[in-house]
Amino acid sequence: MNKISQTEYNNIVALYNSGLSAQKIGDVYSVYASTIRKILNKCNVQMRDDSHKYRKYTLNENYFDVIDDQNKAYILGLLYADGCNYTKTNMIKLELQERDRDILEKINSKLDSNRVLEYIDLHSKNENWQSTYRLTIVNKHMSQTLNDIGMVPRKSLILEFPTCLEKNLYSHFIRGYIDGDGCIYNGKQKFITCATTKQFCESIINILQDELNIHTYYRDIPVKQDSPTKLLYIGGISKIKTFLDYIYEDAELYIQRKYDTYKSFCHEILYK
């Protein structure tokens, strides 16, 4: 590895923080463990003592083999939106704002994982940045399974709606995606937006039309006319209420602050 990119630096740090030893990371990148240690020291990573390598991490690596319940569908949707799958290193990452730590803890539990969430202190570097928590899973089988489903590397440009889902799980998958990449605006103007690919937008538009008789559309992102990423838009109080009722019905997993926005929206239109 002649020149190491910033992305590779970040991945090496994430792999080490997820529990892999410098030796195993070196095997992945075909370099000596000493080289990995130098990189970690350069990144100011606190090194573990030797006893850490004997720690056993748990994981249900078959969790996504069959998407057959609402929690699997929701987590898959959130991974589609905010997750990364590095198939070269078999590493799956999901990073959310500090205030959303609770949902990461719940996902970690659903995966039967005892990985420790990594705190990323961004706010101290820039007061306009929000610190985050990151869940990192390193498992070849799970990484390959997610890749086969459609959570591929550099997915933001080619993402498509997964074909492995039954219709009764669409709403839970969409809720996960909205929790990751969607915005619910409940001010003077009320609307929902979601940035994704044209193909993904078209799939959701068709689902909403078939399941809810909601007609919506997507448009180019302002100042990015030639971008493959489009902006799905749902407007109108009746459509918004129908859509939110649909994705939150019987929901077990969700980001609390977005669910609170939904409940606030319902309260406002009820007593308007």
List PLM regions with ranges:
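Internal intein/HINT superfamily modules and their associated LAGLIDADG
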Residues: 1-272
